Amino acid sequence: MGNGMNKILPSLFIGNFKDARDVEQLHKNNITHILSIHDSARPMLEGMKYLCIPASDSPSQNLIQHFKDSIAFIHECRLKGEGCLVHCLAGVSRSVTLVVAYVMTVTDFGWEDALSAVRGARTCANPNMGFQKQLEDFGKHDVYQFRTWLKETYGENPFNDKDDAKQLLDKHKQQEAAESQSATSSGRQWSSHLTSLSSMSYSNYTTET
């Protein structure tokens, strides 16, 4: 079945194509809405509400045009107290881009912090460079209007999204620090190993006089 969807915010999940067909996982997470974005996106399960967006994982693919519909779909689902799964094929690039745009809209995060927060829950999250540029442009030109639109349309956000996203951001920073420390430690061990080998090699080729 699926490789395991990840909760980003309460009632909001990212997964891959297999997760979107994993009835057990969907039921466990109270998922009633599925946002499907990939080349051949279409409804697959009865009883689910779908938003299907045909889109390739190409840097030139325009995803900004889908941000508003995606954000509305996710937010309306969450306001109902139901779960929403956003998925593409791998749950790495396209789906992550839409969720990052949503996180930016319901918090005051810029695109880099929003992406880092998502990575705190889903370490494989990695939109292609074209999508990252679109998120950067969204943050510069559109996100403030989107925040106003969301509030005027749906009222005050009843969720603690900023606090929840901050926890994920902190988690990601801790993960990065741990990885950096591990890499530094490994580098020192390797350097020590090379020094030891060099010393052994030198002693093997020297003779007493």
From Swiss-Prot:
Residues 4-144 form the Tyrosine-protein phosphatase domain. One of its GO terms (cellular component) is nucleus. It holds the Pfam family DSPc. It is an enzyme of class 3 (hydrolase). Activates the Jnk signaling pathway. Dephosphorylates and deactivates p38 and stress-activated protein kinase/c-Jun N-terminal kinase (SAPK/JNK). Keywords: Cytoplasm, Hydrolase, Nucleus, Protein phosphatase. Belongs to the protein-tyrosine phosphatase family. Non-receptor class dual specificity subfamily. This is Dual specificity protein phosphatase 22. InterPro entries: Dual-sp_phosphatase_cat-dom, Prot-tyrosine_phosphatase-like, Tyr_Pase_dom, TYR_PHOSPHATASE_DUAL_dom. The keyword Cytoplasm applies. It catalyses: O-phospho-L-tyrosyl-[protein] + H2O = L-tyrosyl-[protein] + phosphate; O-phospho-L-seryl-[protein] + H2O = L-seryl-[protein] + phosphate; O-phospho-L-threonyl-[protein] + H2O = L-threonyl-[protein] + phosphate. It is found in: Cytoplasm; Nucleus. Its EC number is 3.1.3.16, 3.1.3.48. Residues 170-193 are annotated as: Disordered. One of its GO terms (molecular function) is protein serine/threonine phosphatase activity. The active site is at residue 88. Residues 177-193 have a biased composition (Low complexity).
